[in-house]
């Protein structure tokens, strides 16, 4: 499940090349059409119709186009969540059961807030201590986490600005930096 097509979110795709060998089928990918276009362009060799030279030569991928409607993956309902990654770019977060994953965001649109209620776990972007144009900074992320009210919040997509131990020691109860 892809959130968006930035390099730090799709460039590891080639590392999946052996997974189809063990799975016995192509690796299913779930993404919006714009992300699919970026994947097909960036990893064109993975979609080449010529036979591969050996089992791990190229990743075998099966792309499933999604939007913000709920879908079922491996018997579990997944709800894609619309998020803003700066003023002009939209990405997806995901809610799976009582867990929500919301990274690369600095704004949660009004229509997404109701889907963040009743969470056990919130995984939320908190890039650094200083404000950023396209990511929540830590203070913004704490405010969002408090508004969501999940039992536990893990901050992710962290820069090297943080002293892990010192920052965790100063966070509100139920909130911590992820690794």
What are these regions, as identified by a protein language model?
Residues 107-179:
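Cap/insert and terminal regions of metallo-dependent hydrolase folds
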């Amino acid at each position: 499940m892809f959130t968006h097509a930035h390099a730090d979110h799709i460039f590891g795709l080639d590392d999946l090349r052996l997974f189809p060998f063990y799975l016995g089928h192509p690796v299913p990918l779930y993404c919006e059409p714009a992300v699919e276009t970026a994947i097909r362009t960036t990893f064109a060799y993975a979609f080449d119709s010529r036979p591969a030279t050996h089992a791990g030569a190229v990743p075998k991928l099966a792309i499933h186009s999604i939007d913000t409607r709920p879908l079922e993956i491996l018997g579990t309902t997944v709800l894609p969540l619309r998020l803003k990654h700066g003023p002009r770019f939209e990405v997806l977060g995901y809610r799976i059961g009582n867990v929500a994953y919301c990274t690369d965001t600095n704004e949660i649109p009004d229509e997404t807030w109701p889907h963040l209620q009743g969470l056990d776990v919130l995984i939320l972007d908190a890039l650094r201590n200083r404000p950023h144009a396209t990511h929540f900074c830590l203070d913004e992320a704490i405010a969002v986490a408090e508004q969501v009210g999940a039992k536990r919040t893990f901050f992710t997509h962290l820069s090297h600005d943080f002293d892990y131990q010192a920052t965790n020691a100063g966070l509100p109860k139920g909130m911590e930096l992820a690794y």
